Amino acid sequence: MVQPALDTDRREEVRRHIHEFQVRFGDIDVLGHVNNCRYLTYLEDARVSMFRLDPLRQGTAPLKGLVVARHEIDYKRPLLLRPDPVRVETWVTELRAASFTLAYEIRDDEHVYVGASSVIVAYDLENTRARRLDEDEIALLEAYR
């Protein structure tokens, strides 16, 4: 089961990456809400934003290979087509030598629609095997812990 959102006191202590997006008509299924498969795309977009576009990354080397080893998603309430954007808040809950766990909330100011987590493994693309996270990667991840 996905770890519950941080309590209010602890939430203020953890820096979260914020990625806003607009629900698109094509995301909606025949039941009138966002299709469950689309949430994985929302999480992917948030990870790319965090690892490639985040201001903390300015002046640092690009992240090396990373692969997703596991996703877990708890659907809390339906997300409908709406004029206002929603956001994915992302933070690090666990950091190991060769992997880390990201937690996510897809939310607006009033509701959490999805809670999720992903285990990400550092990966040597050339040798096709897991590798250790380097100092720059650890520093970025620690900023969200």
Name every feature range the model reports, one short phrase each.
Residues V2-H19, L80-R82, T93-R145:
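HotDog/MaoC-like acyl-thioester-processing domains
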Residues V34, L66-V68, Y113:
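A broad, structural micro-motif
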Residues R24, R38, R47, R70, ...:
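Basic side chains
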Residues L31-G32, T90, T128:
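Hydrophobic pocket/interface hotspot
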Residues N36-R38, V88, L133-I138:
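Short intrinsically disordered coil segments
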Residues F21-F25, Y75, A122:
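Hydrophobic residues in beta-strands and at strand termini
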Residues V2-R52:
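Catalytic strand-loop segment that frames the active site of acyl-thioester-processing enzymes
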Residues M50-R87, W91-A98, V121:
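Hydrophobic beta-strand-centered segment that forms part of the acyl-chain substrate-binding groove
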